[in-house]
Amino acid sequence: MSARDNEKGSARSQPSHAAASEIENVPRPSRQQSWTGTMIKVFIICACAGIVSKYIIPLDSIFKSVHIDPHDYATRANRILSTTPLIDGHNDLPYLIRLETKNKIYDHEKLPFRTGLLSHTDQIKIQEGKLGGQFWSVFVECATDPNAEIDDPTWAVRDTLEQIDVTKRLVQEYPDLLEYCESASCAKAAFKRGKVGSFLGIEGGHQIGNSLASLRQVYDLGVRYITVTHNCDNAFATAASTVAVGKPDLGLTDFGREFVKEMNRLGMLVDLSHVSHQTMRDILSVTKAPVMFSHSSSYALSKHLRNVPDDVLNGVTKNGGVVMVTFVPSFLKVDDPASATIHDAVDHILHVAKVAGWDHVGIGSDFDGTADVPEGLENVSKYPRLIELLLERGVTDEQARKLIGENILRVWSNVEEIAENIRALGEKPNEETWSGRKWTAAIDIPMPFMFKDSADKRKEL
């Protein structure tokens, strides 16, 4: 700025003596008038804020309603994933951590979760895939000896507790990305905060030692679903893998009915993935709450016993549950797994939706739980492409929202509500034990008796 400009500016900034005199003669408002005027302004601002909050559409709703070319599938998919949490029913990353680091997670050079792992799940892939919530499997395998007695729970329960521990610690280690949750409402709130809600699921009743007392304890530790069986029978039910090797499908046991009843009382999701087809039907006939299949596909499209037959899909509709379609190639295309692609996953989703309805389908990848993946679904980052392809096949935005998260959140909320109602009626914890249970022998030192027949009771141990 030149000196001349400065002079002009200075001249303009100085009022004349006459003008100054006029200003001085203007009556100033009294202190009472100033206070009143301020309060009026505050009232107007508050009133406007109230009107906005009551009548103006929330920002996420505005985003949802912005017009987008219906053929711009990528933008539609991005909008859907940005406003509705994609909640995956099953991911086995904690088990990989167990296998490869013995649950040591704090050395970020040895476990570069932020910068990238060769497996299916890490921070970069999660963010690229717009994952909105994850049921992390705190999986422990069945006994390697197929003839092992199922009442040998010591190591399985111990290892399950370790998996619960490492999963919680993993979530705590990355608080900018993950948020631990034990309820459907928390899952929704975490997504609004920009975090991936992280929930715990146990993959097999063997992991709780076939015990309802253990069931209650893992619930208290935050586990929110249990897969009734894994690839082995237990005290509760027959597994699909048992039927696959030619053994009879005995379905749900009497004790299994007590197990389901107690899960309903607690508010824990009953997961039917891995169970035999008869077990599926039996559980649907006795449960008081909606069920889930955390990672299963359609038996009509691929005759793998891990998949769900159409009659069971119809049963899920009546039950109000959800079938979360998985990406395991042998489940998608049992006759030729190597040729499975993302399009096969789309086919399975559409079939489940056609038979069960769009209110009863979800996504349960089984990422990091299978070495083989379909072409196009190599890892967690591929979810947006999956949604794009579904939209290309005619799926509406509303249907896609139900698929990716609204359905499982509804089921979870319903399970919680039913449990509250059951407990409100005064139902107490189930004290039943499995008939094949081997009780720990009494210690060989004198102990006082509680009853007249105590000696006989102790002989039964």
From Swiss-Prot:
Compositionally biased tracts (Basic and acidic residues): 1-10
Organism (species): Coccidioides posadasii (strain RMSCC 757 / Silveira)
Keywords of the record: Dipeptidase, Disulfide bond, Glycoprotein, Hydrolase, Membrane, Metal-binding, Metalloprotease, Protease, Transmembrane, Transmembrane helix, Zinc
Role of this protein: Hydrolyzes a wide range of dipeptides.
Gene Ontology process terms (BP): proteolysis
Residue ranges of the region described as Disordered: 1-31
Record localization: Membrane
Protein name, as recorded: Putative dipeptidase CPSG_01350
Organismal lineage: Eukaryota, Fungi, Dikarya, Ascomycota, Pezizomycotina
Chemical reaction(s) catalysed: an L-aminoacyl-L-amino acid + H2O = 2 an L-alpha-amino acid
Residues at which Zn(2+) 2 binds: 203, 274, 295
GO cellular component, one term: membrane
